[in-house]
Swiss-Prot record:
GO terms for cellular component: extracellular region. Ca(2+) binds at D150, D152, E187, D191. GO terms for molecular function: metal ion binding; pectate lyase activity. Belongs to the polysaccharide lyase 1 family. PLADES subfamily. It comes from Pectobacterium carotovorum subsp. carotovorum (Erwinia carotovora subsp. carotovora). It catalyses: Eliminative cleavage of (1->4)-alpha-D-galacturonan to give oligosaccharides with 4-deoxy-alpha-D-galact-4-enuronosyl groups at their non-reducing ends. Its main location: secreted. Involved in maceration and soft-rotting of plant tissue. This is Pectate lyase 3. Pathway: Glycan metabolism; pectin degradation; 2-dehydro-3-deoxy-D-gluconate from pectin: step 2/5. Its cofactor is Ca(2+).
């Protein structure tokens, strides 16, 4: 089922002109990004503009490099790459061999917020390395080139305290013949790895993605705390996320059209899966592909309450060639530690009925509350 997300306003709206955001992200992240005292505010019309603005912010007034950055940044992006996105859509199998395009934010810890204006779009990614306090909001990422070069839409490496909020990320849930490793027509929507922790992923609309996201890249990269809330995943294959160890809190998400597997909890990780809506989903909660060190989950107040609901919501299961655990009995296998932040989840039914009005871009960063569920 294709979800059509309505726009909250027409035309180009400079979202950065809104009041300073609160650091309560509804998850483990506690950052305002660059939207703090002393911030320098810039407008970018292109990927290169963003790169140049960030590079300039690494230097003091004398042109000397400052460790961690010279000042916090708020970058408003108003570029439009719809033509590149459309060309990529018309040449799906030609994208993976192209060079990856992206903005690398490396070793910047002063804080950066990148926020798109309504109507903006990007055919490039944003890649974080050894940085902290980064916020990415209202960005529309489509059909990233460079699948063979790890051309993710958003990549978070060695970077704590990140908020990914109200974005749209999309491609084609399809694999072209001859791709590198057999699965790189397009790379990930959001990969979080290499000791990155305290990350909140919220109110994003992610569709047509084969490999949605990693939480950890190896069996030794396991310690992180991540929150995924109020996201819509539509026509996606797997990795919602692929969790290697650590803790994941997934609440008030809508999962529809999962073609391989959903939340894959591995390497002794634990996930609190709370008040989500699952439909038309294959293996929505599982631990597979490792063959050992299974993860565990606590299932709390989702629309699916027992195996009796599987047929109603078209929930199906299959086996793996290695040892695996599926949530086929729809029972909790672990107990999640207390959640250390405040959050106010709505019912799973409200997620189904109302979330499309709030998730994704061009929604003026609106959030879904119980008052909106009536």
């Amino acid at each position: 089922m294709k979800y059509l997300l309505p726009s909250a306003a027409a035309g180009l709206l400079l979202l950065a002109a809104q009041p300073t955001m609160a650091a309560n992200t509804g998850g483990y992240a506690t950052t305002d990004g660059g939207d703090v005292a002393g911030a320098v505010k810039k407008t970018a019309r292109s990927m290169q503009d963003i790169i140049d603005i960030i590079e300039a912010a690494k230097l003091d007034s004398n042109g000397k490099k400052v460790k961690g950055g010279a000042y916090p940044l708020v970058i408003t992006y108003n570029g439009n790459e719809d033509a590149l996105i459309k060309a990529a859509e018309n040449d799906i199998c030609g994208q993976w061999k192209k060079d990856a395009r992206g903005v690398e934010i490396k070793e910047f810890t002063k804080g950066i917020t990148i926020i798109g204006t309504n109507g903006s779009s990007a055919n490039f990614g944003i890649w974080l390395t050894k940085s902290s306090d980064i916020v990415i909001r209202n960005m529309r990422f489509g059909y990233m080139p460079g699948g063979a070069q790890d051309g993710d839409a958003i990549r978070i490496d060695n970077t704590p305290n990140v908020w990914i909020d109200h974005n749209e990320i999309f491609a084609k849930n399809f694999e072209c013949a001859g791709t590198k490793d057999g699965d790189t027509t397009f790379e990930s929507a959001i990969d979080i790895k290499k000791a990155s922790t305290n990350v909140t992923v919220s109110y994003n609309y992610i569709h047509g993605i084969k490999k949605v996201g990693l939480s950890g890249f190896s069996s030794s990269d396991t310690g992180r705390d991540l929150t995924y809330h109020h996201n819509i995943y539509d026509d996606v294959n797997a990795r919602l996320p692929l969790q290697r160890g650590g803790q994941v809190h997934a609440y008030n998400n809508l999962y529809t059209g999962i073609t391989s597997s959903g939340l894959n909890v591995r390497q002794k990780g634990i996930a609190l899966i709370e008040r989500n809506w699952f439909e038309n989903a294959k293996n929505p909660v599982t631990s597979r592909y490792d063959g050992s060190n299974f993860g565990t989950w606590e299932l709390r107040n989702n629309n699916v309450m027992s195996p009796a609901d599987f047929a109603k919501y078209n929930i199906t299961w299959d086996k793996d060639t290695k040892p695996y655990v599926n949530a086929e009995d729809w029972k909790s296998t672990g107990t999640f530690a207390s959640v250390p932040y405040s959050y106010s989840p709505v019912s799973a039914q409200c997620v189904k009925d109302k979330l499309a009005n709030y998730a994704g871009v061009n929604k003026n960063l609106a959030v879904l509350t119980a008052a909106n569920c009536n």
